[in-house]
């Protein structure tokens, strides 16, 4: 099926499963549909089964969006507790279209839970509470990790009751858009060819196997990612590479509390070490989602140093690009951090997370170029009443010169060294190879008899999906264009959207202008990078230049490759330095300002020391009295006072404008 046909089906409001081989344009088609909905003001939620896939969609995980977390069952009491979360309830009730990307990695039980929660929250017994659900993915990817003894039949989402109830229309995309052609020694054999042969029913040709084997002799990028089937190989390589580094070493000892068996279960799910040793120069990967920090489970980078900042600042502080000297030492970063006068505004999270047993924390330069500080994260197990039964706290990083194939799902790699000689699960080889853009980026160390084989259940389902997609295509081709257009319009109206041409045109114009501005900002960012030094005042000036162009917080953050909360911190400092600074375009609604101001006054009046950060030179140098207290006030008490109805970033921004 072509993308245009799939979009026509999506616009009717039918529940849809969008699938196809790697590079067939699933994500592109989803983004086109999301753009169509937003132009018509139809409330759409973009989610994915994993953190790294969610970042590709500029969304969040389905687990977080729906409130199911990591559970695989929900009691009536659980549902009642979820209903009490106003933000969650409002979100689920207001959504008209739910998109779930990488559906292959969502367990059947969890799809059932999403269905259960939506029915409960929306008080609607129709599948998924009556909203349109669009799931996308490729079931030739590895299935989600399940309980011991579970078969793939138990795990695949298409085997769930929710899937059957939804009655998904199948859109199987057949065009190729990612894999590059004309590669390798034999121009007739491309990675696209090989992947399609693996998916096909006739097996992989001798020429394709030879093309793969010939990559053993290729020299690929020295910064390549290494993919292995087993953790033992991954650990061996990572430990070897770590030993070669001569940089500063810090070891983090995890902290565990509660029931021993539950703690062990947490450790297995976290997949990190009780004793985590890191060095400057290490390749690392985050192992827990942190939307406020801007990282996902699977985000990769390089450890460029360690810092000894206060715990509150550390968990969430983001460091400006270029704040380290060329050798990546931490001293320049420490100096830059110490100059920050408004640590609270730079905080990415005010949850007072527990600390692991050290006072030095990793500074990671992400592959995107942004730099962040990683603080200890806590994983917990709760009972039905919310009481914590077990907890495990560790720095959410793992060494990442090598990673398992399972962990690589959702990534797109320019170069990789892959060892399939110990393949033990059907589909591992396909997943590993489909991470790459071309054969030119592949160095294959070995294969075995399982490496190029796929799960029979997935293969059978895929064949059925193709047949159902053809049926859907033929059915829609018989519908007259005018009738189809009327169907599209009915769904928009039923979803609370608009057909007003002027409004749609205004959205499209704004969208084009935003794209144009983004291109200009990228050019401006490059110019600033060449002009500005690595000092704090220079990075403030870079933000000010963009601010004076009336760009939004999000636009400035994207342009500079920084977190939005970091930019808010810059705005706060700039406004204190120059109260006449023109940033009124960022000013929140008066109703929000009044609510935040009232909360601040109440918290200051209560005078609970736990609601304030410890004083330091930077805060004392600003003002005294109530203004001094306002500078030190934590975000969490404000958030709680407002009953979680105003998000952290809006509170941060409001504080800038409260006198």
From Swiss-Prot:
InterPro entries: AAA+_ATPase (IPR003593), DNA_helicase_pif1-like_DEAD (IPR010285), Helicase_HTH (IPR029491), P-loop_NTPase (IPR027417), PIF1_helicase (IPR051055). This is ATP-dependent DNA helicase Pif1. Monomer. GO terms for biological process: DNA recombination; DNA repair; telomere maintenance. Its EC number is 5.6.2.3. It catalyses: Couples ATP hydrolysis with the unwinding of duplex DNA at the replication fork by translocating in the 5'-3' direction. This creates two antiparallel DNA single strands (ssDNA). The leading ssDNA polymer is the template for DNA polymerase III holoenzyme which synthesizes a continuous strand; ATP + H2O = ADP + phosphate + H(+). One of its GO terms (molecular function) is ATP hydrolysis activity. DNA-dependent ATPase and 5'-3' DNA helicase that efficiently unwinds G-quadruplex (G4) DNA structures. May be involved in resolving commom issues that arise during DNA replication, recombination, and repair. Keywords: ATP-binding, DNA damage, DNA recombination, DNA repair, DNA-binding, Helicase, Hydrolase, Isomerase, Nucleotide-binding. Belongs to the helicase family. PIF1 subfamily. It comes from Psychrobacter sp. (strain PRwf-1). It comes from the Bacteria. Its cofactor is Mg(2+). Pfam families: HTH_40, PIF1. The keyword Repeat does not apply. SUPFAM superfamilies: P-loop containing nucleoside triphosphate hydrolases.
């Amino acid at each position: 099926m072509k993308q245009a046909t799939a979009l026509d089906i999506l616009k009717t409001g039918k529940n849809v499963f969008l699938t196809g081989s790697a590079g067939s344009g699933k994500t592109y088609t989803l983004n086109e549909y999301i753009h169509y909905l937003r132009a018509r003001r139809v409330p759409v939620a973009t989610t994915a089964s994993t953190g790294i896939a969610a970042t590709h969609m500029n969304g969040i995980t389905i687990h977080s969006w729906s409130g199911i977390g990591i559970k695989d069952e929900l009691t009536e009491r659980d549902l009642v507790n979820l209903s009490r979360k106003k933000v969650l309830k409002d979100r689920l009730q207001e959504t008209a279209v739910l998109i779930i990307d990488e559906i292959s990695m969502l367990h059947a039980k969890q799809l059932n839970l999403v269905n259960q929660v939506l029915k409960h929250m929306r008080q609607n017994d129709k599948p998924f509470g009556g909203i349109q659900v669009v799931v996308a993915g490729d079931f030739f990817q590895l299935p989600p990790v399940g309980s011991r003894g579970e078969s793939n039949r138990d795990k695949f989402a298409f085997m769930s009751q929710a899937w059957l109830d939804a009655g998904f229309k199948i859109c199987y995309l057949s065009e190729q858009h990612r894999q590059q052609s004309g590669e390798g020694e034999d121009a007739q054999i491309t990675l696209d060819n090989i992947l399609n042969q693996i998916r096909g029913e006739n097996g992989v040709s001798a020429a394709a196997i030879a093309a793969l084997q010939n990559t053993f002799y290729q020299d690929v990028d020295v910064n390549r990612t290494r993919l292995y089937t087993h953790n033992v190989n991954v650990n061996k390589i990572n430990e070897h590479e770590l030993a070669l580094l001569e940089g500063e070493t810090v070891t983090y000892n995890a902290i565990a509390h509660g029931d021993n068996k539950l703690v062990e279960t947490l450790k297995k799910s976290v997949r990190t070490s009780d004793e985590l040793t890191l060095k400057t120069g290490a390749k690392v990967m985050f192992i827990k989602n942190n939307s406020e920090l801007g990282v996902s489970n699977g985000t990769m980078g390089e450890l460029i140093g360690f810092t000894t900042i206060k715990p509150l600042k550390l968990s969430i502080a983001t460091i400006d690009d270029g704040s380290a000297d060329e050798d990546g030492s931490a001293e320049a970063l420490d100096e830059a951090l110490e100059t920050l006068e408004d640590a609270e505004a730079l905080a990415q999270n005010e949850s007072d997370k527990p600390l692991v047993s050290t006072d030095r924390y990793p500074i990671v330069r992400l592959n995107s170029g942004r730099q962040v500080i990683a603080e200890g994260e806590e994983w917990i197990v709760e009972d039905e009443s919310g009481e914590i039964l077990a907890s495990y706290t560790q720095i959410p990083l793992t060494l990442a010169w090598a990673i398992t194939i399972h962990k690589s799902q959702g990534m797109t790699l320019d170069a990789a060294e892959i060892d399939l000689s110990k393949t033990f699960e059907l589909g591992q080889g396909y997943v590993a190879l489909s991470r790459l853009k071309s054969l030119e980026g592949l160095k294959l160390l070995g294969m075995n008899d399982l490496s190029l084989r796929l799960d029979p259940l997935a293969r059978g389902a895929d064949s059925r999906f193709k047949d159902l997609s053809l049926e859907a295509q033929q059915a829609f081709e018989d519908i007259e264009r005018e009738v189809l257009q009327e169907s599209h319009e009915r769904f928009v109206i039923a979803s609370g959207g608009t057909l007003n041409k002027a409004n749609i045109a205004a959205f499209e114009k704004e969208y084009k202008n935003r794209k144009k501005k983004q291109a200009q900002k990228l050019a401006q960012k490059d110019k600033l990078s060449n002009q500005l030094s690595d000092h704090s005042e220079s990075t403030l000036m870079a933000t000010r230049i963009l601010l004076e162009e009336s760009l939004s917080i999000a636009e400035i953050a994207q342009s500079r490759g920084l977190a939005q909360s970091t930019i808010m911190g810059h705005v706060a400092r700039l406004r204190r330095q120059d109260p006449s600074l023109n940033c009124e375009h960022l000013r929140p609604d008066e109703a929000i300002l009044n609510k935040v101001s009232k909360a601040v006054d109440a918290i200051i009046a209560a005078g609970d020391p736990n609601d304030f950060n410890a004083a330091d030179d930077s805060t004392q140098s600003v003002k005294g009295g109530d203004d001094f207290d306002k500078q030190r006030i934590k975000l969490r008490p404000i958030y709680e006072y407002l009953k979680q109805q105003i998000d952290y970033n809006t509170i941060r921004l409001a504080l800038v404008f409260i006198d």
